[in-house]
Amino acid sequence: MNQNFYSMIDRYKHQQLRIGPVSPQQISAWANKILPNGEVVGEVTKPYTFHYKTNKPEKDGLFCERIFGPIKSGICACGNYRVIGAEKEDPKFCEQCGVEFVDSRVRRYQMGYIKLACPVTHVWYLKRLPSYIANLLDKPLKELEGLVYCDFSFARPIAKKPTFLRLRGSFEYEIQSWKYSIPLFFTTQGFETFRNREISTGAGAIREQLADLDLRIITDNSLIEWKELGDEGSTGNEWEDRKIRRRKDFLVRRMELAKHFIRTNVEPEWMVLCLLPVLPPELRPIIQIDGGKLMSSDINELYRRVIYRNNTLTDLLTTSRSTPGELVMCQEKLVQEAVDTLLDNGIRGQPMRDGHNKVYKSFSDVIEGKEGRFRETLLGKRVDYSGRSVIVVGPSLSLHQCGLPREIAIELFQTFVIRGLIRQHVASNIGIAKSKIREKEPIVWEILQEVMQGHPVLLNRAPTLHRLGIQAFQPILVEGRAICLHPLVCKGFNADFDGDQMAVHVPLSLEAQAEARLLMFSHMNLLSPAIGDPISVPTQDMLIGLYVLTIGNPRGICANRYNFFNCKNDENAPLDNDNYQATKEKEPHFSSSYDALGAYRRKRIRLDSPLWLRWRLDQRVIIGSREVPLEVQYESFGTYHEIYRHYLIVRSVKKEICSIYIRTTVGHISFYREIEEAIQGFYRAYSYAS
């Protein structure tokens, strides 16, 4: 691999990959290599693969050993063998066939290129929505497509020179369209001279317009127009207002695209190809199966189609002098369509098929989707220190915790447990430690608990479409074989508990653990990175639970028309369905929330049973209230009780407030205590941070 490619991969000692347009010089630098005799190879000029008699790669073909390296390590096309890396004065390549004596693995990354006879537009940047080329040129996509596929031409502005196109105004009528009539007047060379002088068509016209763009001027002009449209305000016409909004959205996209090109040092004309890269042979193999038959990648056939058409166009432009110009335009269109099919088959309509009516897999089909090169081969590989299981709800977990089954945890942290067993002199070597783990001795689980306390794990749910698709958690040992997850983090993962699976990974290096703790913990990712809205919000089951918890008894206070102090409530008598009808009117009173929760745990009251709870309420709130009591009950000792809708006041003979009771339920008490603990915990954390 050449030094330029190495510098891209190994920059700053980190492996990185950037996908985007590249210059023709960069493509040439990736593909070209200089042999020890000074010859430069890298261009693929022939559409052949292997010779049908010798089964050897054709020279300058799609599997040429001079361009891509030897098929067998250290063996050239002639059959000579040299020891790889031997420091001798012998040349490192065969002087007869020009093949270098290198490792055959070079065929996995050594690229080639096809020198196109005419510029070709990259179909990804033309046809994919939004069209980058149409955005930058500010022209309709249909107009650009007609220009690319030679359906019409642009006239070049030539000042103070007689032009053939000015004759168009001399005719009163036209028998044919000028698109078809102009090429009929010229031979090949004459048409090329005319086209280069007066008209512009094909991808070359797109390339010229992109090369003339100034991205900074585009950004400034788009911003000025956007501000002018914003200052105009509403016109009162719904159709016109919609057109203005669409235009403003287009200007924003255009500015963002231009800024991205400036930031990444990409020139707009690179979206039009002059050199077509050829993939390494090992990525598009030809395999021989039983019976001597060959199986080839579809990309090889698409490359052959491009080379055939490109060579035909080259012959028309260089050798033939009497070919009509119309034929040249038609051949350029065929080259453009062949490259489109190679890059993205079917993007322009009907896909290309083979003799068995099977659609060819283009480059886009190979890399995109769930079974593509990235998601299946590169990102979907199994890795060490990872596991996978179904997720279930863990309502008792904290937001930053996850429940890890014992079977998964002991496998993930086995090396750490072995080290702990040896350090504590429980086992003398690795073999004994593994046997203790297999026997599941109690000391194993104790050491596993210690290891897991300071080691976060990463949970990932595919597809990982944004950064919240993988988050860090503190693992907790649980029984069973399913991973327990807090329900509040499901929205970030786009997960639910209907059979979804998640993968668990163990960060090993200190850098990875620090990143997990500082950036990836679930309780530190409460907001959506896209729009900033809260993403850890109660949904579905949690909302239903909160509703049931706080619904209370709908009968209201008017159902109780007696002094609650006269009700004798046996604290030890459990409440069942049989005697509930007889006792449900008796609303008990409690001096603290702990007593109320204790009575609920003893099944003395229900979750929604109304009760009176003594409460420390600011008397100024009571005095300032203008609410009239629903009922006043007097005691024999002179004290009396003012019963309001939601609270009750006990006053002395001197009308002083002795105590205040509020009417609530166990559900409200539980909910209040949870909120109170959360606020206090937040306050303590904030005070500690300050």
UniProtKB/Swiss-Prot annotation:
<feature type="binding site">
    <location>
        <position position="500"/>
    </location>
    <ligand>
        <name>Mg(2+)</name>
    </ligand>
</feature>
<keyword id="KW-0808">Transferase</keyword>
<dbReference type="GO" id="GO:0000287">
    <property type="term" value="F:magnesium ion binding"/>
</dbReference>
<dbReference type="GO" id="GO:0006351">
    <property type="term" value="P:DNA-templated transcription"/>
</dbReference>
<dbReference type="GO" id="GO:0000428">
    <property type="term" value="C:DNA-directed RNA polymerase complex"/>
</dbReference>
<dbReference type="GO" id="GO:0005739">
    <property type="term" value="C:mitochondrion"/>
</dbReference>
<feature type="binding site">
    <location>
        <position position="97"/>
    </location>
    <ligand>
        <name>Zn(2+)</name>
    </ligand>
</feature>
<feature type="binding site">
    <location>
        <position position="94"/>
    </location>
    <ligand>
        <name>Zn(2+)</name>
    </ligand>
</feature>
<dbReference type="GO" id="GO:0003677">
    <property type="term" value="F:DNA binding"/>
</dbReference>
<feature type="binding site">
    <location>
        <position position="78"/>
    </location>
    <ligand>
        <name>Zn(2+)</name>
    </ligand>
</feature>
<protein>
    <recommendedName>
        <fullName>DNA-directed RNA polymerase subunit beta'</fullName>
        <ecNumber>2.7.7.6</ecNumber>
    </recommendedName>
</protein>
<dbReference type="InterPro" id="IPR034678">
    <property type="entry name" value="RNApol_RpoC1"/>
</dbReference>
<dbReference type="InterPro" id="IPR042102">
    <property type="entry name" value="RNA_pol_Rpb1_3_sf"/>
</dbReference>
<dbReference type="GO" id="GO:0009507">
    <property type="term" value="C:chloroplast"/>
</dbReference>
<comment type="subunit">
    <text>In plastids the minimal PEP RNA polymerase catalytic core is composed of four subunits: alpha, beta, beta', and beta''. When a (nuclear-encoded) sigma factor is associated with the core the holoenzyme is formed, which can initiate transcription.</text>
</comment>
<keyword id="KW-0804">Transcription</keyword>
<keyword id="KW-0460">Magnesium</keyword>
<comment type="function">
    <text>DNA-dependent RNA polymerase catalyzes the transcription of DNA into RNA using the four ribonucleoside triphosphates as substrates.</text>
</comment>
<dbReference type="InterPro" id="IPR006592">
    <property type="entry name" value="RNA_pol_N"/>
</dbReference>
<keyword id="KW-0150">Chloroplast</keyword>
<keyword id="KW-0479">Metal-binding</keyword>
<keyword id="KW-0548">Nucleotidyltransferase</keyword>
<keyword id="KW-0240">DNA-directed RNA polymerase</keyword>
<dbReference type="GO" id="GO:0003899">
    <property type="term" value="F:DNA-directed RNA polymerase activity"/>
</dbReference>
<dbReference type="InterPro" id="IPR044893">
    <property type="entry name" value="RNA_pol_Rpb1_clamp_domain"/>
</dbReference>
<dbReference type="GO" id="GO:0008270">
    <property type="term" value="F:zinc ion binding"/>
</dbReference>
<dbReference type="InterPro" id="IPR007080">
    <property type="entry name" value="RNA_pol_Rpb1_1"/>
</dbReference>
<feature type="binding site">
    <location>
        <position position="496"/>
    </location>
    <ligand>
        <name>Mg(2+)</name>
    </ligand>
</feature>
<feature type="binding site">
    <location>
        <position position="76"/>
    </location>
    <ligand>
        <name>Zn(2+)</name>
    </ligand>
</feature>
<comment type="similarity">
    <text>Belongs to the RNA polymerase beta' chain family. RpoC1 subfamily.</text>
</comment>
<keyword id="KW-0862">Zinc</keyword>
<dbReference type="Pfam" id="PF04997">
    <property type="entry name" value="RNA_pol_Rpb1_1"/>
</dbReference>
<keyword id="KW-0934">Plastid</keyword>
<dbReference type="InterPro" id="IPR000722">
    <property type="entry name" value="RNA_pol_asu"/>
</dbReference>
<feature type="binding site">
    <location>
        <position position="498"/>
    </location>
    <ligand>
        <name>Mg(2+)</name>
    </ligand>
</feature>
<dbReference type="InterPro" id="IPR045867">
    <property type="entry name" value="DNA-dir_RpoC_beta_prime"/>
</dbReference>
<dbReference type="Pfam" id="PF00623">
    <property type="entry name" value="RNA_pol_Rpb1_2"/>
</dbReference>
